Amino acid sequence: MDIREMDLKRQEANALFKKQMIDEALEIYKTSFLEATKSVVPGTRNDLLEEQLSLLAYNISVVYYKRKNFPKSLAFGLESLKHRKSDKVLCKICAIYLRLGMLREYKEMYDQMVTRSSGPEVAFLLKRMKLSEVIVEKHLEKRVTLESLHELSKEISGGRSIPADTLESILEQGESILLGCENVVHTESSGEVLIFGDTHGQYFDVVSILNKVFDKDRMVIFNGDYVDRGSHSVENFALLLSLKILFPGRVHLTRGNHELSDINRVYGFYDEVKRKYPFSSDSVYRRFQDAFRALPISIIVNEKVFITHGGLPEAPVKVDNLQEIYRMTDTHTDELLKGLLWSDPEEILGTEESKRRAGVVFGADVTARFLERNGLDLLVRSHQAVDDGYRVHHGGKVVTIFSAPEYEGSKGPGSYLVLNPSAGEADEIVEISPLTRYKAVKFGRSDGKEVLRLLCN
């Protein structure tokens, strides 16, 4: 493919992009970029070819930005800069840094651009970005620290609400980090991994158990449904999001069905926000929804354990398909997303209609097919209040974990799951494969006044 053909292909893709035919445009951009890289001759530089490589990489970056896949957008933005310096690309990378919560990188690049001699277009972009630069300065000053989180915990224990400006800062910082996650987060751990299910606003119970089990050698995963029903939903999600900000590689959060606005507006969370923030409830509630929409859908641990809030969709699916879901939504139009957030396992074959009117009831054969197709050993999900906070389905291939003790007046405990337990009686530990072992641990209610006391680094 010569330079002229590359340019024509790129213009064809641009036309498709303008018509909102995003998938078709991306395919042409990527194919053309790959062909262009084959034309590079080592040890020589062709300025026209470098220009096409830069433009194509930038176009790909823009598509991924539009899809809110900011890590890939950043990768292709930086690739574009390798081939040609461009103020427009620098501005785009600034915007990506901001969305990813990479505030210092944003500030450094913004300062560089201010000192560059730029044309009127870039001057206009910089003027628009000035507000973001002010926000970044504010967040660098109000960045969450372990010390500030401890102090906030003391205030909550004393019966006081989180100040609205502090809460909105936590939500903005957390959203930026969550936006940097793919739909399905792949993570590795050689140590224990603790998985918690629904916590439903039971903030003090969460603080109590974290004080006992959270340390520098353990990864912690919370599997959705942080809000509604309990009386401290605001504090519960703010705490867990703060831990995600502080320990982004060790704390992971997924989205549950109660992180959908049409659910949490009805089941208590919206009323809690109005009660605690009467003068800024709309703004605070909107900030929460922005953060909820940014939550990843699923997590895979050590390429063997698949964690998602609800269960499996009706149609056969591979993990790669899940990465293409548009998750920044509150609608129920995507069948894959509905299945992941709403479905439940039963001892049946195939699938049946769910009484929830969303997702399906799925059987052991559906589980086996999904695990086999994706090279997985175990599905961990939440979504249902079960006896003892823990239930095994489908011959041990599916585990439900529920972490709200004495939920809605019941007497049952909460539980969390320990992957790769380092200790435990032989009859406590379930071995799915040589690489996948787990045990469930029960816990009860706190005294309702717990203060966070994390001593890890």
UniProtKB/Swiss-Prot annotation:
One of its GO terms (molecular function) is protein serine/threonine phosphatase activity. Mn(2+) 1 binds at D198, H200, D225. Disulfide bonds: none annotated. The active site is at H258. It is an enzyme of class 3 (hydrolase). Signal peptide: none annotated. Binds 2 manganese ions per subunit. PANTHER family: SERINE/THREONINE-PROTEIN PHOSPHATASE 5-RELATED (PTHR45668), SERINE_THREONINE-PROTEIN PHOSPHATASE 7 (PTHR45668:SF9). Belongs to the PPP phosphatase family. PP-1 subfamily. This is Probable serine/threonine-protein phosphatase ECU05_0440. It comes from Encephalitozoon cuniculi (strain GB-M1).
